[in-house]
């Protein structure tokens, strides 16, 4: 979604919506990895019914990852996608339905954004390749050492678009994957799987929402179904709220900024391409055994609990003394609608509303102040009341001028603080501090040595700094009156106040008077006094707001509508919108896949199109050559970076495009015609599913007509089933489209075409909670907790899905022991991470173990709940006889789980119970005393350095 900072703002404002996922890792024995049994209870202590996968959010990171080497070929990409789905399935473990949705042909309103993204990706890819080649030649000319350039074809991510051979092959691979899991994985035993590939029109997340809406409208639908949607787009949160399902959770990757990446030239860590010096690669390990290994950093996942977000919104949106009855569900719909003004995939955001400036909070406050005058809510089941929206927007327009001035003041203050900070740091720090192995270390850190990483790079930086110092102190360098060296003659001294990066030119200057005239003149090339044009822009934007809300709540209102401008109007221009029409043409049809490719692809990606179609992009005599500019301008629009700007691409004229394609349609081969046709969804079940026999019977009877799906056999799911060609059938071999994977010779799964329940075009899906739905128990601290809490118990926040989870504690000696095994300073390498992984203590609501933490469960093997501890383990069980050559016995790491009630006469010191009198000298020498009588258990050493000899 077009709100890059929306999730960051949401997670900071409503922190309790986030829960870290618990993932059960596969165990490895003798080099063989045993798969996880997903039929067992979910380790997150919650059971999900349906899992929906927005597949494009999986395909992109698997085909061109940013934090690890990319797959070498298409087969490896498919395997990476399979493994990613396995991870998500292992975490969520759905019990009823798995719905995989790949983006199909998008509405025309979305195609403009897709076109901008793909043109940018092509342009940035070529520019990056040229810059890389330029830097490579410069380094080699200076005598630098670089690995030989690997000759390989660059993966064009634009192929992840409906109609390409890649997407067609992906659909085949996913059908094979589903059949394989239904045959072999016990967690898939009773699961219904629906695959909506790229041939089915619609965006992936909206196909999922359309399925949920249509199933909710059925009488057999379970109103307490627990949904889990996988995807990283911010609009999934709004879509989940729009369903009004009380049990809705989103799972997504946890965003971690500034991940280390290898240099694209020398493949070494620690610098970017622009800073590469072409230094020889350091030996990694004694025998260079770690040469090709990158720092292990497996992606982690988080849950977003929309039920908790609803709790937050209920507190924030509840209003008293309204002239009408307060309805929380309607207020949630209004909140979703107001978020559209900040940005979305179909409309540019209003100039005065920035998510980073608290625009949503500002809108909510105005909404709560004005709603008493409006006489009702802004929306109802996806339809907008424009008269009430006009009151909100004009209220925003009244403060637009102050918003722009405050934005300028905040920006100037930020720059001033940054300059002062740089000056202060330059004054308070020495001119040069060596880093890496040469950096000065405190005496207390000698017990935690830091690994040497790329010392040649560090030595090079030190030599360069020495040269600069020698230049400054050379005889040709004159001295100022205060004795400081001054630059040599002929060299222009850099201003101390100059910024390292030039500021983009802003011709609009929204903080100065006349901003509206300058805006319309620069952005639309019209005078602000042209009231007719301004009203046209506002009307198009209002149509867009109505179209987007209808898209979220009722489905696509029109496949052909789009916003025909690059920029949005001002909020103060929303006058007289109450009488503007907001109806859309009925019966519109989506583009065909190859037609969409012609509408969104640049000429550089024309190799994914048939030859004669490709020629229309490059032939100077082509009637649509103007749709494919080789270069285009990017308007920063007041922003700092190019990716934040607006790509000024010409809009595609659908009439001209179709007229040009009529001449080349006869050139399509049968295979291309098949890829150019629109398809539907496919349903899969295994042999143990109650629906399996019913589907097999349809094939045996050779029935070709659609039949109603029996809801009693499939958890209330309804729809139409139709036998299809090339179906997966029992006892029929399923050939593997990936050469490295085996064929399924003993298949027992079956597939059939599936179509959602159909409704009249004028049918309205009600945006409300269904009868019989049970509200989840509250998670947030009650506002009257202090008044109603009579026993004085402190409020214990809920960290996971289960409020009744009993916490397990460690005593102080256990934490001290962990402190010995871990580095003292943050950021220093060590065997373990600095944060104690509570997941090893039996808590299912903590982050899974990272690669460096896998040994901690071994250190905590004797961990027991507090109630069951009956004293220390006998000495002979903890200290078995060591043999020569054995690994160091970490018996002192046997830790006690909780602070216990010690027997009388025992001293409770920092390390736990002690059965001997405590003296100051004993405290100092305690860790160096040998085992002896009166000491029933082992004690930890005094520091991380422990001599076992």
Swiss-Prot record:
Protein's GO biological process: mRNA processing; nuclear-transcribed mRNA catabolic process; spermatogenesis; termination of RNA polymerase II transcription
Biased composition (Basic residues): 416-427
Keywords: Exonuclease, Hydrolase, Metal-binding, mRNA processing, Nuclease, Nucleus, Transcription, Transcription regulation, Transcription termination, Zinc, Zinc-finger
Zn finger region (CCHC-type): 261-278
Cell compartment(s), UniProt: Nucleus, Nucleolus
Listed EC numbers: 3.1.13.-
Bias kind Basic and acidic residues: ranges: 783-794, 919-928
Entries under InterPro entries matching the protein: 5_3_exoribonuclease, Xrn1_helical, Xrn1_N, Xrn2/3/4
Composition bias type Polar residues, residue spans: 438-452, 469-484
Pfam families per record: XRN_M, XRN_N
Superkingdom classification of source: Eukaryota
GO cellular component: aggresome; nucleolus; nucleoplasm; nucleus
Annotated stretches, region: Disordered: 410-452, 466-507, 775-803, 902-949
GO MF annotation list: 5'-3' exonuclease activity; 5'-3' RNA exonuclease activity; identical protein binding; RNA binding; transcription termination site sequence-specific DNA binding; zinc ion binding
Protein family per UniProt: Belongs to the 5'-3' exonuclease family. XRN2/RAT1 subfamily.
Function: Possesses 5'->3' exoribonuclease activity. May promote the termination of transcription by RNA polymerase II.
This protein's name: 5'-3' exoribonuclease 2
Organism: Gallus gallus (Chicken)
Species classification: Eukaryota, Metazoa, Chordata, Craniata, Vertebrata
Gene: XRN2
